[in-house]
């Protein structure tokens, strides 16, 4: 439940505590402020400074990061500090940064401070919640485990997602993480009518604009709130934008009792921004130059993403993997919090299989007979066994050729190639590029189709019939067009 300390006292933005200080030092986004003795603002308090730059008046928001002693506080600016000089008056608001919450945030774009970007001034009269909040108490957590059906074959069969869980999309640059997130927003809105909150953390501004346009064209913008802190923003903004979006999602969960989907693109940029802030604050770096507080900062975010009794926040997070190195501390720290991982592979991508999920590297904690059922588990394990054996045979095939394999292995390779192609699927997010409508396959049909495929029922069907299609009906049509019958 929400405590009064975590809400603002009234609608609108928090007001002043009538305590003012003055700027004594500006170093990029780091601003040192001196306050009167006995009036030092608390950590995470928001401070406001009125400045004029190039004839434009604006209000800078600073967040208290450190107490330096001698009545000095060190703050991080959430906007560019151009025009800020020594001696400028700084007002302590008496509260932390807060964002608007409520049904009205859907269909709009906000920044990390809660300012509406598509309609300036919108949302100022809404109730505001602090972005720094405690996770739900242990006794409030939902004990049941339930699968979230997506309609994507490769996900539902091999890496089933947990309702109210944390799911990560791992991959290097350009393998389709953002496209898969857009696909999930489409599917959740169309198939379940659920509320989605999207956090754009340190990614390209162009992608944010494209997402806004595509959601509007797909008629799902009305069910989605977007919060952006793009890569041209100061590190303080990129570090806080995920918390701002999560706070909006928590309102839908706690006050409306809804199941909410929270999309974060990209969680690596959250870590990267924290590293920049840590360096600016003069902290000693840890492994590979990351901040010493990496695990703590990640935990503060991830522990708030959870299910309470009867309602949930399901999180899907894109994770950029630097240089495709999974031992890097940023993706490695994220692993500890996840219920399912979907790894997008450059090798699969190069085959033209989309979504480019590596079925052998992806995993889920609920791929277990006690959760998904014996039949689902059996079929998934058989698919994995065939694909793993095919991978083991790759070197032999490359050196000696497929003709040197035993008849049993030849048959297995042929089935594995069909399975690989059948794991591809036409997606809603790619309709405008492919001209093919996206398909949704019920999990029961997915299990039946792959069970028959593993048993050899489709050995006579050409490989290309399995490529970028939906379920069994699509397979029958494609096979017939190629002169085969199921």
From Swiss-Prot:
Topology with respect to the bilayer: Peripheral membrane protein
Keyword Ion transport applies: yes
Reactions catalysed, as given in the entry: ATP + H2O + 4 H(+)(in) = ADP + phosphate + 5 H(+)(out)
Positions with a binding annotation for ATP: 171-178
Superkingdom, natural source: Bacteria
SMART domains in UniProt: AAA
GO cellular component, one term: peptidoglycan-based cell wall
GO molecular function: ATP binding; ATP hydrolysis activity; proton-transporting ATP synthase activity, rotational mechanism
Enzyme Commission no: 7.1.2.2
Biased composition (Basic and acidic residues): 1-12
Record's keyword annotation contains Ribonucleoprotein: no
Pfam families: ATP-synt_ab, ATP-synt_ab_N, ATP-synt_VA_C
InterPro entries: AAA+_ATPase (IPR003593), ATP-synt_VA_C (IPR055190), ATP_synth_F1_bsu (IPR005722), ATPase_a/bsu_AS (IPR020003), ATPase_alpha/beta_chains (IPR050053), ATPase_F1/V1/A1_a/bsu_N (IPR004100), ATPase_F1/V1/A1_a/bsu_N_sf (IPR036121), ATPase_F1/V1/A1_a/bsu_nucl-bd (IPR000194)
Subcellular location: Cell membrane
CDD domains the record matches: ATP-synt_F1_beta_C, ATP-synt_F1_beta_N, F1-ATPase_beta_CD
Coiled coil: none
Keywords: Acetylation, ATP synthesis, ATP-binding, Cell membrane, CF(1), Hydrogen ion transport, Ion transport, Membrane, Nucleotide-binding, Translocase, Transport
Chain positions found as N-acetylthreonine: 2
Region annotation (Disordered) ranges: 1-22
Known partners and oligomeric status: F-type ATPases have 2 components, CF(1) - the catalytic core - and CF(0) - the membrane proton channel. CF(1) has five subunits: alpha(3), beta(3), gamma(1), delta(1), epsilon(1). CF(0) has three main subunits: a(1), b(2) and c(9-12). The alpha and beta chains form an alternating ring which encloses part of the gamma chain. CF(1) is attached to CF(0) by a central stalk formed by the gamma and epsilon chains, while a peripheral stalk is formed by the delta and b chains.
Known function: Produces ATP from ADP in the presence of a proton gradient across the membrane. The catalytic sites are hosted primarily by the beta subunits.
UniProt family annotation: Belongs to the ATPase alpha/beta chains family.
Designated name of the protein: ATP synthase subunit beta
Originating species: Mycobacterium tuberculosis (strain ATCC 25618 / H37Rv)
């Amino acid at each position: 439940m929400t405590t009064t300390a975590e809400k603002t006292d009234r609608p609108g933005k928090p007001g002043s505590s009538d305590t003012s200080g003055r700027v004594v030092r500006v170093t990029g986004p780091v601003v040192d402020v001196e306050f009167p003795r006995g009036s030092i603002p608390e950590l995470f308090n928001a401070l406001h400074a009125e400045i004029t730059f190039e004839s434009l008046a604006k209000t800078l928001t600073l967040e208290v990061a450190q107490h330096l002693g001698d009545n000095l506080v060190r703050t991080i600016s959430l906007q560019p500090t151009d025009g800020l000089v020594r001696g400028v008056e700084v007002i302590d608001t008496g509260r932390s940064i807060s964002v608007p919450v409520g049904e009205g945030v859907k269909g709009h774009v906000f920044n990390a401070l809660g300012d509406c970007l598509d309609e300036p001034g919108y949302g100022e009269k809404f109730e505001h919640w602090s972005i720094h909040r405690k996770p739900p108490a242990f006794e409030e957590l939902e004990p049941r485990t339930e699968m979230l059906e997506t309609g994507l074959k490769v996900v539902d069969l091999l890496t089933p997602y947990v309702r109210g869980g944390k799911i990560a999309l791992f991959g290097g640059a350009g393998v389709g993480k953002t496209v898969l997130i857009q696909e999930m927003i489409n599917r959740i809105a169309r198939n379940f009518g659920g509320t989605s909150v999207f956090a754009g953390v340190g990614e390209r501004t162009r992608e944010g604009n494209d997402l806004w346009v595509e959601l509007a064209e797909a008629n799902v913008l009305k069910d989605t709130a977007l919060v952006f802190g793009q890569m041209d923003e100061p590190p303080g903004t990129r570090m806080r934008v995920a918390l701002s979006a999560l706070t909006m999602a928590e309102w839908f969960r706690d006050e409306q009792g809804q199941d909410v989907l929270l999309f974060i693109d990209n969680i690596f940029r959250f870590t990267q921004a924290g590293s920049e802030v840590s360096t600016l604050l003069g902290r000693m770096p840890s492994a590979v130059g990351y901040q010493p507080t990496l695990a703590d900062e990640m935990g503060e975010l991830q522990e708030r993403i959870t299910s309470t009794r009867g309602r949930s926040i399901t999180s899907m997070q894109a994770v950029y993997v630097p240089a495709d190195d999974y031992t890097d501390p940023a993706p490695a720290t994220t692993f500890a919090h996840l219920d399912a991982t979907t790894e997008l592979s450059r090798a699969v991508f190069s085959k033209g299989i989309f979504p480019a999920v590596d079925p052998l590297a992806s995993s889920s904690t609920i791929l277990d007979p006690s959760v998904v059922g014996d039949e689902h588990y059996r079929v998934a394990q058989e698919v994995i066994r065939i694909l793993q054996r095919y991978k083991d045979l790759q070197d032999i095939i490359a050196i000696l050729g497929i003709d040197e394999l035993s008849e049993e292995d030849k048959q297995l390779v042929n089935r594995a190639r069909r399975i690989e192609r059948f794991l591809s699927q036409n997606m809603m997010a790619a309709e405008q590029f492919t001209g093919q409508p996206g398909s949704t396959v019920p999990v029961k049909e997915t299990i039946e189709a792959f069970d028959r495929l593993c048993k050899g029922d489709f050995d006579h069907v050409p490989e290309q019939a399995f490529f970028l299609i939906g379920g069994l009906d699509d397979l029958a049509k494609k096979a017939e067009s190629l002169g085969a019958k199921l």
